[in-house]
């Protein structure tokens, strides 16, 4: 059986930090995974349900969902995923079955890691979502102007913004 999320946390949190807090930063999916668990604990709802009801629906996005682990479980309008060259196309299945699977179909427990990504939606859905959090006129934002400013503020070339890999005054935003 695959490790439980709690076991995953135990293993990851036992690893030493690469630097002291406040000295440097590094992008970490673990932070988003922890955030999804906090959302579930505080809201009393599964993460996907909470995000759909409280974030996506108010943004006008009604056809976004968390990806599944296997090709045969993908939604009708979901793309076919491919593994990047050099990433190793085949690996052992995430659930320790011993099966060798395509990395993008069974290599990871995607629903378990949902807070760190895995959201699927069309280009139109993604555009509606971004328009609802960008602070620009035309589409009502679902977050406060203060939150938009915190999320999109440019600090310096070595500092991540809140929720984005990078925000730049001229180049714009870069994905998480």
Task: Name these PLM-found stretches.
Residues 1-175:
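Short, surface-exposed loop or secondary-structure junction motifs
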């Amino acid at each position: 059986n695959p490790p439980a999320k709690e076991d995953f946390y135990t293993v990851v949190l036992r690893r030493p930090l690469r630097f002291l807090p406040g000295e440097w930063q590094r992008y970490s999916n673990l932070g988003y995974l922890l955030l999804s668990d906090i959302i579930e604990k505080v809201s009393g709802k599964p993460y996907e349900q909470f995000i759909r009801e409280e974030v996506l629906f108010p943004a006008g996005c009604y056809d976004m969902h968390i990806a599944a682990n296997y090709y045969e479980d993908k939604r009708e309008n979901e793309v076919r995923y491919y593994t990047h060259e050099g990433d190793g196309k085949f690996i052992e299945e995430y659930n320790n079955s011993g099966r060798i699977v395509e990395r993008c179909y069974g290599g990871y427990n995607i629903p378990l890691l949902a807070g760190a990504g895995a959201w699927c939606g069309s280009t139109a859905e993604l555009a509606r979502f971004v328009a609802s959090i960008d602070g620009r006129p035309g589409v009502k934002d679902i977050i406060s102007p203060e939150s938009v400013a915190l999320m999109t503020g440019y600090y310096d070339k070595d500092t991540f913004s809140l929720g984005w890999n990078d925000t730049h005054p001229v180049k714009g935003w870069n994905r998480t």
